């Protein structure tokens, strides 16, 4: 009697409309079911039958119901699909094309076809770029994608690079130069400094050399420094085709094994590069560093010609200063340049230690990759004294540029860092107080107070406290007007020393030149700083993704079973520990199941960065632990580790 009853139908509709809804992100599992994460602390169960219409990462609205005394959700409306433009691997079955998205947790085949503009022919195992066109939660009967581009084939040894670049929609080739791009456009009078003994210090294999230095000592102990920077804007006119290309790339993209330059290589590695014994146009800055380490107020920017007398390597210069190895400078004059630069470096380090913020020495890892993409080894590179010589010289040059721009026109591309926002400043002060470190919010939100905090933390040298405070800090950014850089400890900072590889430095070059030539300066638009930040983010993600891929290949070929690795804990997540292997820099994940067998007794406290078992703290961020590798998953580029420990009672 209730069949086709309009009143009952209306009642069901009313009940359905009044049922609570929740919004969140779908998280799938390997066992078919999933969860709808509405915030970091709350999630709802999605049964396997309800997972068929959604994908991991989809942002949805779901109907909240109760089934067998358990709250579950039923996906109802798609807000934003996880997949839009994506990369994946082609599978061919019965002459039909499918694509498997290259993302963890996405394993299902998606039906696909090349779109009308794609001329590629796809084979099994090819890698491709695709666009999701149909989604089941939108009412479509299947997930469907259009192939827009073939990335490469299955046997290409450079798959990690090409797929990653395609994933982040980054260029994979250098821009092409036309004949006119290689002709010097500026006819300005330049100072002839070709007789001075300028030197460059860089990695042995560096070809795009931006900076050269010349120093001399004064009788009163002050040091005169001329920083000469390659001048690509003398060849590339504002608004030209090549300038537009550079403004889109923003940076040279440095990936493990090779780079994709912002400018054509015959400009960046030859015509503009400050190669030894080659006459080159430069934008130069004459700075005096006083014997107490301060920078003199008298700063001069000018155009010049120089001829670098020698290309030196970081290791050779460091060895000679540290009196190890057999290398000696090629001439007495160059030896003298190194000695004065070393003195300048020590003066500035002493000054920055007292008045600004010093960086902690960190270990860097570099992949040694063959021309054919084979990973030969992972090398540890430490910052040595020659690195610090160049670093201190560039910092002096960038402070000088910021001051010069601010004084003359009041704008440019500035690197800024705001320290703490108000909420995080309060959290930081509360955290510090628990370690008997007494600071006020007012104090640490000033540049002077922030620098003092960083100096205190450097003296304490507690990596856990340091990591927690960094978590409260703001991110670095760019600004078109002067602003402080708290993390460096300077009232203003503007880079101009890498115009071959950074478009922001090219912008500052043009502004500095407009001041020198007494021409009208055009303020950069606000949109450019957003483009710079976004491109930097994408480049960094690409570097991380390629590295993760190469580490899985590298370690899979090693006999890692039962080998113990020292590791540093870098993060605590909801379900495990992230750590970095000290030996080679690989990031590993330690799931809770490999830490303690009873999940209910485990507490991963992300807020404090600690792991508790039965209320007792066992691990925290910055701890050094020993691990073994239990699984290396090439498909998801993840390395699973487990701690070396005695079983918990």
Curated annotation (Swiss-Prot):
* Superkingdom: Bacteria
Name used for this protein in its record: Exoribonuclease 2
Report if keyword Transmembrane helix is assigned.
no
Keywords of the record, alphabetical order, are: Cytoplasm, Exonuclease, Hydrolase, Nuclease, RNA-binding
What the entry lists under PROSITE patterns is as follows: RIBONUCLEASE_II
Q: What is its main location?
A: cytoplasm
Gene encoding this chain? Answer: rnb
Q: Which HAMAP family match?
A: RNase_II
């Amino acid at each position: 009697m209730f069949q086709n009853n309009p009143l009952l139908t209306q009642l069901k509709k009313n009940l359905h409309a009044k049922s609570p809804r929740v919004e969140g992100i779908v998280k799938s599992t390997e066992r078919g079911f999933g969860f709808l994460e509405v915030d970091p602390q709350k999630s709802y169960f999605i049964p396997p039958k309800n997972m068929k219409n959604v994908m991991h990462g989809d942002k949805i609205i779901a109907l909240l119901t109760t089934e067998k005394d358990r709250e579950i959700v039923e996906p109802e409306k798609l807000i934003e699909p996880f997949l839009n433009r994506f990369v994946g691997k082609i599978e061919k079955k019965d002459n039909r094309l499918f694509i498997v998205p290259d993302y963890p947790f996405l394993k299902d085949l998606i039906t696909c076809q090349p779109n009308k503009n794609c001329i590629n022919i796809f084979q099994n195992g090819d890698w491709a770029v695709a666009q999701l066109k149909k989604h089941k939660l939108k009412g479509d009967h299947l997930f469907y994608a259009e192939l827009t581009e073939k990335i490469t084939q299955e046997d290409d040894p450079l798959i990690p690079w090409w797929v990653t670049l395609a994933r982040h929609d980054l260029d994979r080739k250098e821009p092409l130069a036309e004949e006119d791009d290689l002709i010097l456009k500026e006819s300005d009078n330049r100072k002839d400094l070709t007789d001075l003994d300028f030197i460059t210090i860089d990695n042995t294999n560096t070809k795009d050399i931006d900076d050269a230095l010349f120093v001399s000592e004064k009788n009163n102990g002050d040091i005169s420094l001329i920083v000469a920077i390659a001048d690509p804007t003398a060849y590339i006119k504002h608004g030209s085709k090549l300038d537009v290309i550079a403004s889109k790339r923003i940076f040279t993209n440095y990936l493990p094994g090779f780079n994709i330059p912002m400018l054509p290589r015959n400009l960046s590695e030859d015509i503009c590069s400050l190669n030894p014994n080659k006459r080159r146009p430069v934008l130069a800055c004459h700075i005096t560093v006083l014997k107490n380490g301060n920078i003199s107020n008298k700063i001069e920017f000018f155009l010049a010609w120089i001829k670098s007398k020698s290309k030196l390597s970081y290791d050779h210069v460091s060895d000679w200063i540290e009196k190890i190895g057999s290398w000696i400078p090629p001439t007495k004059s160059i030896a003298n340049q190194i000695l004065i630069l070393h003195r300048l470096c020590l003066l500035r380090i002493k000054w920055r230690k007292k008045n600004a913020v010093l960086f902690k020495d960190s270990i860097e890892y570099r992949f040694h990759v063959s021309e054919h993409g084979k990973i030969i080894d992972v090398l540890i590179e430490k910052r040595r004294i020659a690195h610090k010589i160049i670093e201190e010289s560039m910092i002096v040059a960038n402070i000088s540029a910021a001051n010069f721009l601010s004084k003359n026109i009041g704008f440019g591309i500035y690197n800024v860092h705001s320290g703490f926002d108000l909420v995080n400043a309060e959290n930081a002060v509360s955290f510090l107080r628990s370690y008997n470190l007494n600071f006020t919010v007012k104090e640490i939100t000033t540049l002077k107070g922030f620098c003092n905090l960083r100096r205190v933390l450097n003296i304490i040298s507690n990596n856990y406290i340091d990591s927690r405070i960094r978590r409260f800090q703001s991110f670095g950014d760019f600004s078109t007007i002067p602003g402080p850089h708290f993390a460096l400890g300077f009232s203003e900072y503007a880079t101009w020393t890498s115009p071959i590889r950074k478009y922001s430095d090219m912008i500052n070059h043009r502004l500095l030149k407009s001041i020198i030539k007494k021409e009208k300066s055009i303020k950069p638009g606000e949109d450019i700083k957003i483009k710079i930040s976004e491109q930097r983010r994408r480049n960094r993600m690409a570097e991380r993704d390629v590295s993760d891929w190469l580490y899985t290949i590298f370690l899979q070929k090693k006999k890692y079973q039962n080998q113990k690795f020292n590791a540093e804990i870098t993060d605590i997540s909801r379900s495990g520990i992230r750590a970095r292997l000290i030996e080679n820099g690989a990031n590993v994940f330690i799931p809770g199941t490999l830490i303690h067998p009873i999940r209910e007794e485990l507490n991963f406290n992300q807020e404090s960065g600690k792991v508790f078992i039965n209320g007792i703290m066992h691990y925290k961020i910055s701890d050094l632990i020993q691990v073994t590798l239990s699984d290396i998953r090439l498909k998801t580029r993840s390395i699973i580790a487990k701690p070396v420990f005695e079983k918990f009672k």
